Regions:
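Mg2+-dependent endonuclease catalytic cores in nucleic-acid-processing enzymes, primarily RNase H-like
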Residues: 9-120, 139, 149-151
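Short, small-residue-biased leader/transition segments that mark boundaries at the very start
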Residues: 3-8
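Acidic, Mg2+-coordinating catalytic module of metal-dependent nucleases/exonucleases
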Residues: 117-140
Length: 151
């Protein structure tokens, strides 16, 4: 069996329309991505599956887009597991990611109703981490090759 190696995030792109007081268009985000990736060879871009127009913009520009697995609770659990196993680490350069890890909290009102979900505030970097970990590093179901026949 192949051991998965550690993933190191050594840089980040971060923009908050709320903090900056101005939203960007999908084209502006795509321009930023191209500039940020300058000279970097990538296989694909992982995107929130709800961002249909951004996916269309990236596809139009020739990027291969992977729609992120977006189950929040399971994604958070997997991120916690990978962090504890040191399968993902973050450089000090990733200040916004580190800041968001420190401020990521569970929604108390949702918990009163039996829901596990985080407060949806200052979570752009956390969403990006969760999308990567859950979509790319998530456990794949293994086939039992010893069993013959159907389901």
């Amino acid at each position: 069996r192949r051991q998965r190696q550690m993933c190191i995030r050594d840089r980040e792109y971060y923009y908050s329309g709320r903090e900056e007081g101005q939203q960007k268009t999908d084209a502006e985000y795509a321009d930023d991505l191209e500039s940020w990736l300058s000279g970097t060879d990538i296989n694909a871009v992982i995107v929130d599956p709800a961002a249909a127009s951004f996916i269309a913009e990236l596809t139009k520009r020739g990027y291969r887009v992977i729609k992120a697995k977006n189950d929040v609770a399971d994604g958070i659990r997997l991120v916690a597991t990978k962090l504890n196993l040191l399968k993902i680490v973050f450089s000090n350069i990733c200040q916004d990611t580190i800041k968001e890890f420190a401020s990521y909290i569970w929604d108390a009102k949702a918990a009163e109703h039996g829901e596990d979900k985080p407060v949806k505030q200052y979570d752009h970097a956390m969403d990006a981490v969760r999308y990567f970990v859950y979509t790319i590093l998530g456990e794949r179901p293994r086939l039992n090759r010893k069993v013959k026949g159907g389901i």
